[in-house]
């Protein structure tokens, strides 16, 4: 679905922007995470962290991935127990390594990227702005992609949804 969106098909794949690599590394992170959830093997958790580290080096939005996974673990019945194992913590520590070059660059450049990003936000939540953002995404993704994506997220709320479907839905909700 995602690659059908004009931006990802044309803009993210042709122009020199960090979105293409970001999305590739996030997709690899999600694949590794699904394997880690199934196997609970250290190598799968480490792979999740490695791909997340590359994503974190691409763009700040990659930080929504671990936040979404943490929300899933805390808010889904019984999943919090995974936090008692070393796997998620290994993934998180390796993932944070991807921020190291970003932080070092910001230290050397008076936190320029943070000043840029924080200077573009307003002081409070505005429902009209949120609605405008959702409409913009719907147009940006082409109506068919937006509708199919919305249906896929809705399907993830069903009782018979698989762990993989629910987990991917939680990861997708973060950026939305």
Residue ranges of each PLM-predicted region?
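Membrane-embedded alpha-helical segments of multi-pass membrane proteins
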Residues: 20-28, 66-67
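Membrane-interface transmembrane helices that cradle and orient dolichyl/undecaprenyl
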Residues: 29-45, 151-157
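Membrane-interface alpha helices of multi-pass inner-membrane proteins
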Residues: 44-59, 94-96
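Transmembrane-lumen/periplasm boundary regions of multi-pass, lipid-linked membrane glycan transferases
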Residues: 54, 66-165
């Amino acid at each position: 679905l995602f690659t059908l969106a004009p931006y990802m098909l044309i803009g993210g794949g042709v122009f020199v922007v960090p979105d293409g690599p970001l999305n590739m590394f996030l997709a690899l992170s999600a694949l590794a995470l699904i394997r880690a959830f199934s196997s609970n093997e250290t190598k799968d958790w480490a792979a999740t962290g490695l791909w997340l580290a590359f994503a974190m080096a691409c763009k700040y939005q990659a930080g929504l991935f671990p936040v979404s996974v943490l929300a899933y673990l805390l808010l889904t019945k019984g999943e919090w127990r995974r936090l008692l194992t070393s796997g998620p913590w290994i993934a998180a520590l390796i993932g944070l390594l991807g921020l190291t070059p970003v932080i070092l660059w910001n230290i050397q450049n008076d936190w320029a990227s943070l000043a840029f990003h924080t200077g573009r936000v307003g002081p409070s939540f505005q429902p009209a702005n949120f609605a405008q953002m959702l409409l913009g995404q719907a147009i940006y993704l082409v109506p068919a992609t937006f509708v199919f994506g919305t249906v896929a997220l809705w399907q993830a709320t069903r009782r018979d949804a698989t762990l993989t479907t629910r987990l991917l839905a939680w990861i997708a909700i973060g950026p939305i």
